[in-house]
Amino acid sequence: MKLRFQRVALVGKYQAPTSAGMSDSSRDALDGIARFLANEGCEVALEADTAANTGFTDYPALSVERIGLDCDLCLVVGGDGTMLGVGRQLAQYRTPLIGINQGRLGFITDIPLGEYPTVLKPMLRGEYEEDLRPLMRARVMRQGQCVFEALAMNDVVVNRGSTSGMVELRVEVGGHFVSNQRADGLIIASPTGSTAYALSAGGPMLHPTIPGWVLAPIAPHTLSNRPIVLSDSMEVAVEVVSGRDVSANFDMQSLASLQHGDRILVQRSDYRARFLHPRGWNYFATLRKKLRWNEGGY
């Protein structure tokens, strides 16, 4: 069967430190996958930082932008954090992504490392399930000016510093005042992020096809302050009323320090990440496996 993807880029989890910047297991995994892809007839490229940290010179090194412009597919080898970082950058190019899990839980990097040869072979020829995930656009406004802007796939989190007390946040949804919340922080999560930090804060899991967000307080002062499910068509505004060392995190990978009076505006982005899964994949099977439902015969 003819290849569906000719030019394939590899991105590795190079944050695992060794003297060379990447663990031996990660380097070996990338080497094996690159050789597999080449044997399948693909033109293989490496993301520039991945190439630098592996020391591999047999394949061209491309920036993420060039991957988006020139490659048919991006294979991410690592955990969900690696996929989030790459997925945000490639969403504007509509480049499909496949995740090979070298992390722990792996909700969106769902192919086990030891199974990639048998799983990838049919996927490279067009046998896959496509899964579109919306992104969030967040801006930090200070005295009417945007001082920071970022995309998020999982969540936008406004929270206190590690040594400070509660923060007070004024929350508006769709231009309507909701409440002033005193808590350790507030999470605005997408369906993808609803199984991450928001879940540990008591929020519900949203199916990926639901056009909604979860608004979940972190350790609220008032117990009646519960998570809310919102339409993602509405802008969420969070204003810092009081608190010390307050910050906004975007997928826990970029951070903005906040001042009193700052407003964080969160809107649905025009971009969506394109994840590809093996044929037969479904969301509920992922939940059942990752959250260990039905183990022990129940």
Swiss-Prot record:
Binding site for NAD(+): 80-81, 154-155, 182, 184, 195-200, 219, 253
Predominant location category: cytoplasm
Cellular component aspect of the GO annotation: cytoplasm
Active site (UniProt): 80 (proton acceptor)
InterPro entries: ATP-NAD_kinase_N, ATP-NAD_kinase_PpnK-typ_C, NAD/diacylglycerol_kinase_sf, NADK
EC numbers on record: 2.7.1.23
Localization: Cytoplasm
Reactions accelerated catalytically: NAD(+) + ATP = ADP + NADP(+) + H(+)
Gene3D superfamilies on file: Probable inorganic polyphosphate/atp-NAD kinase, domain 1, Probable inorganic polyphosphate/atp-NAD kinase, domain 2
Cofactor field: a divalent metal cation
An example Gene Ontology molecular-function term: metal ion binding
Annotated keywords: ATP-binding, Cytoplasm, Kinase, NAD, NADP, Nucleotide-binding, Transferase
GO biological process: NAD metabolic process; NADP biosynthetic process
EC top class named in words: transferase
HAMAP family: NAD_kinase (MF_00361)
NCBIfam families: PRK02155.1
Function in brief: Involved in the regulation of the intracellular balance of NAD and NADP, and is a key enzyme in the biosynthesis of NADP. Catalyzes specifically the phosphorylation on 2'-hydroxyl of the adenosine moiety of NAD to yield NADP.
Family that this chain belongs to: Belongs to the NAD kinase family.
Protein name: NAD kinase
Organism: Paracidovorax citrulli (strain AAC00-1) (Acidovorax citrulli)
